[in-house]
Regions:
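Short, small-residue-biased leader/transition segments that mark boundaries at the very start
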Residues: 2-3
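Substrate-recognition/cap regions that form aromatic- and gly/pro-loop-enriched pockets
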Residues: 12-168
Length: 168
């Protein structure tokens, strides 16, 4: 179906843009250079890829990625419990932290997708190293998270459809 295909294509490009945006400052500062070099090069080439090829690659990657669901379920549970359930937090804090975790997850998955496109494998070690790297890159104080969200999005609280869109 044409609309589903367009949504899937748009999601791939949006996920890639989010990944590039999250890594911009690190690249500029020369941080994590060796870890990011190859995937950033691939990320910049995504826009030029044939969409049919990209969709097929994403489908194949998701087949491999699904084997790691339990690991990611545990990771996301730990992130939500530690970042969203704050003693003095309010509903907006909860939502913003949940969105930040979604960005973190999207960046991890996009990094792994780009790496998988280059190397054809998805190993526990690569997943572990990627989670560690992205968590370091996104481990900011609350003030910075709010500032980033405000700068990158119209509002710090997204439409729920956008959250679902980037997580596809």
């Amino acid at each position: 179906d044409v609309y589903k295909r367009q949504d899937q294509e748009s999601a791939i490009f949006e996920q890639n843009e989010l990944f590039l945006d999250l890594t911009t400052n690190y690249e500029r500062e020369g941080l994590y250079k060796s870890e990011l070099k190859d995937v950033l090069n691939k990320a910049r080439l995504i826009e030029e890829e044939n969409s049919t090829f990209l969709l097929e690659q994403k489908r194949k990657f998701n087949d491999h990625f699904s084997k790691w669901q339990e690991l990611f379920r545990s990771f996301l549970t730990a992130e939500i419990e530690s970042d969203c359930l704050l003693p003095d937090g309010n509903l907006q804090d909860f939502i913003v932290h949940l969105e930040w975790i979604a960005l973190e997850y999207t960046a991890i998955k996009q990094f792994l997708f780009l790496d998988w496109m280059q190397n054809g494998s998805l190993t526990y070690e690569k997943i572990r190293d990627t989670i560690t790297l992205v968590c370091r890159m996104t481990g900011y104080e609350e003030d910075y998270i709010y500032e980033y969200m405000q700068d990158c999005f119209d509002d710090v609280v997204w439409e729920w459809g956008y959250l679902a869109f980037i997580l596809t």
